[in-house]
Curated annotation (Swiss-Prot):
GO CC term, one of those recorded: plasma membrane
Annotated localization: Cell membrane
Official protein name in the record: Transmembrane 7 superfamily member 3
Membrane topology summary: Multi-pass membrane protein
Native organism taxonomy: Eukaryota, Metazoa, Chordata, Craniata, Vertebrata
Organism expressing this protein natively: Mus musculus
Keyword set includes Glycoprotein: yes
């Protein structure tokens, strides 16, 4: 029994040694299909060697990954643009010569800090397509890499077209001589997306999940296919950016004639910087955003439970959203102001919009106009939620005209449906929109996918290129919890207000008419004590006189004792 235990321990030790790799004297030895963890430093570059390559292998794909520090992989010790690649996720394709059984790569980093890395070597036969084999855009002759670029709005990946496979010691098939079924134009490209756990920014987690996105079978089993491209399509795909959320992308090139596939080098992003001071990956929300969203959520929470009873507060909330949304879009598209300045101006404009809607109700009392604004705000949220579903990724909605017309029709449909029961419309808007403001506030402190229900619409209004982006977000444990909280707040607020308003007038009376009637009553009714109240000017003069008396010295009153006792 003890011999069996020793044997098991020896096997485990051997496996661990293979996984970590022997890096003594700057030398790493790899095995095909096995991930190797190692630490790369500026002072000690590494030499990676793969031995005992099978004779039926035509080309090798070597790749190295790190979290955010750059690494370099090269065919030669002297770095050249055509024989090396530098980045977080980089790889090289090596076309084997006849009888070649050993292959060598050189690894290094220019970062002053040690870089925890993971590397992998994959082998392919002559029937497999070659990722990046028809590269005409990037530096490498054969470039299997995905080039990723992101901003606040979208994340874009680009890659070089592949070529069909060929045997050792033969010339590669021409890339652009013909478009027949015997050329690379028959190839198809499947784009995959994989989400890391929400809120997990650890290096170990990333390197672990990258193993699920490197080989064809694992990519198909773990990730979600977002799009399929043909050789006629542009080799670039855009996605909505998710700051603070880790995402891994990869492309599988498929040869339908031979039914063979090969994977490009996976690439990852968090759509944020690990090294910036404000708005970094650990805390993606700015301080100004946190203050704004927190105050907005407090107002929304009050409206959620008491909006219909405090009708003017409800109107202020709706007017704030209505004018603030359009004002932010306007100043963002027309001015180069900084984000914090734009947010402050939006708060001022939103407050003005809220006061304007309250003033219009006080003076004119047009209930239909006020409820149209309330219904449009609720309709905006309903329409945004509709396009948050897979419906929003349909190709027809990549056209701005079709999208905005459909979006507006859905938003207008809500007030039209509820025009016969305005009180129910207002209570629904208070409960749903007011509780959603809490979701937006949560997003400034921790990532939640639910905030992108409205943020994606805002991005589309701000950036014309966003129309072509695929809108996909993770839905994990945090999102289920926040969705439950949102639903609980909305249902509680709606139920409470419906029960409280039972038997009450649907809406308060026109304030200006009440004020006018009260003024006429005081003028005509001399028995009313308020009739004898002095005019406002006299009351102000009287108060000023009383205040002045407080600062005057007491005057002497003459003799204070009687002369005669």
């Amino acid at each position: 029994m003890w011999r069996l235990r020793l044997l098991v321990l020896a096997v485990l030790a051997a496996g661990s040694a293979e996984a970590q790799a022997n890096s003594s004297d700057g030398f790493l030895e790899f095995s095909v299909g096995k991930f190797t963890y190692f630490v790369l430093s500026k002072s000690s570059p590494q030499e990676a060697v793969l031995r005992h390559i099978s004779s039926n292998v035509t080309f090798l794909l070597f790749q190295i990954h790190s979290q955010y520090q750059n690494t370099t992989v090269s065919f030669t010790k002297t770095l050249l643009p055509s024989t090396s690649g530098t980045g977080n996720d980089r790889g090289l394709v090596f076309i084997l010569r006849p009888e070649q059984a050993v292959c060598t790569w050189y690894l290094e980093t220019g970062d002053t800090k040690p870089v925890q890395s993971v590397a992998l070597t994959l082998s392919y036969s002559e029937r497999d397509p070659i990722p990046g084999g028809c590269n005409l855009e990037f530096d490498l002759d054969i470039d299997p890499n995905l080039y990723l670029d992101y901003n606040f709005f979208e994340t874009t990946i680009k890659f070089a077209p592949a070529n069909i496979g060929y045997a050792r010691a033969t010339e590669p098939p021409p890339c652009d001589v013909s478009t027949s079924r015997e050329s690379r134009w028959r190839l198809r490209y499947d784009v995959y997306q994989y989400f890391l756990p929400e809120g997990d920014l650890t290096e170990a987690s990333l390197l672990h999940h990258l193993q699920r996105m490197a080989q064809v079978a694992q990519v198909k089993a773990s990730a979600i296919k977002v799009a399929t491209l043909t050789a006629d399509d542009k080799t670039a795909v855009s996605f909505s950016s998710l700051p603070g959320q880790g995402v891994i992308y990869n492309v599988i090139v498929w040869d339908p004639s031979l039914n063979t596939s090969a994977a490009y080098v996976p690439v990852h992003t968090y759509a944020c910087s690990f090294e910036s001071v404000d708005g970094n990956c650990a805390s993606p929300g700015r301080v100004s955003t946190k203050v704004f969203s927190t105050l907005f959520a407090l107002l929304g929470l009050f409206v959620c439970f008491f909006g219909h009873r405090f009708w003017k507060t409800d109107l202020f909330f709706v007017g704030f959203i209505f004018l603030g949304f359009f004002f932010y879009i306007l100043i963002t598209r027309l001015t180069p102001l900084q984000y914090d300045v734009r947010l402050a101006l939006t708060a001022v404009a939103g407050s003005f919009g809220g006061l304007l809607l309250v003033a219009s109700w006080w003076r004119f009392g047009i209930l239909t106009l006020c409820m149209l604004c309330v219904g449009l705000v609720l309709g905006f949220l309903v329409s945004s939620g509709t396009f948050f579903t897979p419906l929003g990724n349909l190709n027809v909605f990549h056209d701005d005209g079709v999208f905005w017309v459909t979006f507006s029709c859905i938003a207008l449909l809500v007030p039209v449906i509820f025009m016969g029961c305005l009180r129910i419309l207002n209570i629904l808007a208070c409960g749903v929109v007011g509780s959603y403001s809490v979701v937006l506030a949560v997003n400034s402190y921790m990532f939640t996918s639910l905030s992108y229900i409205t943020l994606n619409v805002l991005r589309r209004a701000l950036n014309t290129d966003f129309r072509g982006a695929f809108i996909r977000v993770p839905f994990q444990t945090n999102d289920y919890i926040i969705l439950a909280v949102w639903g609980m707040l909305a249902v509680s607020g709606i139920t409470l207000q419906i029960r409280r308003e039972r038997g009450q007038p649907p809406f308060p009376p026109h304030p200006y008419k009440l004020w006018k009637q009260e003024r006429e009553r005081r003028v005509t009714n001399i028995l009313d004590p308020s009739h004898h109240i002095p005019p406002l000017r006299e009351r102000l003069y009287g108060r000023v006189a009383r205040i002045k008396e407080l600062f005057q010295k007491e005057q002497p009153a003459g003799e204070r004792t009687p002369l005669l006792l």
